[in-house]
A protein has these predicted regions:
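Active-site-surrounding "flap" and adjacent substrate/cofactor-binding loops of secreted or lumenal enzymes
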Residues: 106-110
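Core alpha/beta structural scaffold of self-assembling particle/tube/pore-forming proteins
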Residues: 38-67, 71-75, 87-91, 101, ...
Length: 389
């Protein structure tokens, strides 16, 4: 491991300790940051990296760390600042200039490439927490108690973001951002249909597996121009809140805002394996029998082959809990090393195969990998998707 990587790990650990001493973190969260310091990868800029570099106070970094604990997407997703206050405009090449075979004394006509501008909008995701003043006063560490109460609201932010990243459709919900599924919604009749692979499911319990190569030049998250990692926290102070019966009580409020979006600069760097029949997968029968041409292991290999260059960014598979579980089981059944479960990376012990190192209770587990590409879990990937054709 390079010296710079060691220094980054030490710095991240020190940040956790400093935030703990300032009262911004409870001990459990601080320990997660110290453990998480061992997980950094050079060459990729995720939301936490941006937050740490742009907000020296540590407040935004703390929020991002909490988001990162319960959303595996943020672990690898690369982010960049949009070039618009409300989104990001990308110029996409739609055609190449023509070339001709020239003869002697024959002129060459001028030619140019064709380009199109695509604007990806950013959505504003908000939530607020209200904690009874007396409940706060009962706890010695008031700020830590408020932060712990706010974690449920941050989890709501997490789930909404993950759901929108895959299924957001601005034609139906204009206040959100455009997700991946509407962009990769057809196998035939669309230019990017070559990157939509069917697993053969025809019932009502279908899901999708996604392969995404994160990079500012391929696919990445965006946040508004001039903002700090898109996440804001405002302490609303003490005010009158209302219960279910519209009766007043004094509360301490917090407002959380996450301005975020998604831009696809090059559609070739995402592949959707759709129509994965969950019943067949669990039973290892039908479309998901080991001998079937539509078995997900075979289709994941095909998905990787559709990517022009796996080194163009950070490649990651995303699947729901059931799919990831079956891949972990396959890793134990197979003698070859196509699928593997990485061992724990430090002395804190192991949890169930497929768990994300550094999350949960502060102990580290293995990461499921397919041909070296990590497989991340996302519970927001539905198991009742409509059949894609």
């Amino acid at each position: 491991m390079k010296l710079t990587t060691h220094l980054q790990m030490i710095f991240a650990a020190l940040v956790g300790l400093v935030l703990l001493s300032l009262g911004w973190l409870d001990p459990a969260t601080a320990s997660l940051m110290v453990i998480g310091a061992t997980l950094g990868q050079s060459g990729k800029v995720n939301l936490h990296d941006i937050a740490k570099s742009l907000d020296p106070s540590g407040k935004t970094a703390t929020v991002v760390e909490l988001l990162n604990q319960s959303n595996e997407i943020i672990t690898d997703m690369v982010w960049m600042e949009g070039n618009l206050p409300t989104g990001h405009e990308t110029t996409v090449r739609t055609g190449l200039p023509t070339a001709i075979w020239r003869q002697l004394y024959q002129g060459v006509p001028a030619s140019k490439s064709q380009r199109a501008k695509v604007t990806d909008a950013i959505g504003m995701l908000e939530t607020r927490s209200e904690v009874d003043v007396e409940a706060v006063n009962l706890n010695a560490q008031n700020e830590n108690f408020r932060l712990s109460e706010a974690k449920a609201f941050l989890e709501g932010l997490n789930q909404q973001f993950a759901q929108t990243m895959f299924y957001g459709n601005t034609a139906i919900n204009p206040e959100r951002f455009m997700g991946l599924a509407p962009r990769y919604s057809a196998i035939s009749g669309a230019t990017n249909g070559v990157n939509v692979i069917s697993a053969g499911g025809a019932g009502a319990d279908n899901t999708s597996i996604w392969l995404i190569v994160w990079s500012p030049e391929t696919i990445c998250g965006i946040y508004p121009k001039g903002s700090v990692a898109g996440i804001q926290h405002k302490d609303l102070g003490e005010y009158d809140a209302f219960d279910a019966n519209s009766q007043r009580f004094r509360a301490l409020g917090d407002l959380w805002k996450w301005k975020c979006g998604l831009t696809v600069s090059d559609w070739r760097y995402a592949v959707r394996i759709c129509n994965v029949d969950i019943s067949d997968l669990v039973g290892q029968t039908g479309t998901q029998a080991s001998t079937a041409a539509t078995a997900i292991i075979k289709l994941m290999i095909r998905a990787m082959a559709r990517i022009p260059s796996m080194g163009a960014g950070v490649p990651v598979f995303y699947a729901n809990r059931t799919v990831k579980e079956m891949l972990a089981i396959a890793a134990m059944d197979k003698s070859q090393n196509a699928i593997s479960v990485e061992p724990a990376i430090n002395q804190f012990g192991q949890v169930a195969p497929g768990s994300v190192a550094g999350q949960g209770t502060g102990i580290s587990g293995g990461t499921v990998r397919f041909l070296g590409v990590p497989v991340r879990g996302c519970d927001q990937l539905l198991t009742n998707e409509a059949v894609v054709s």
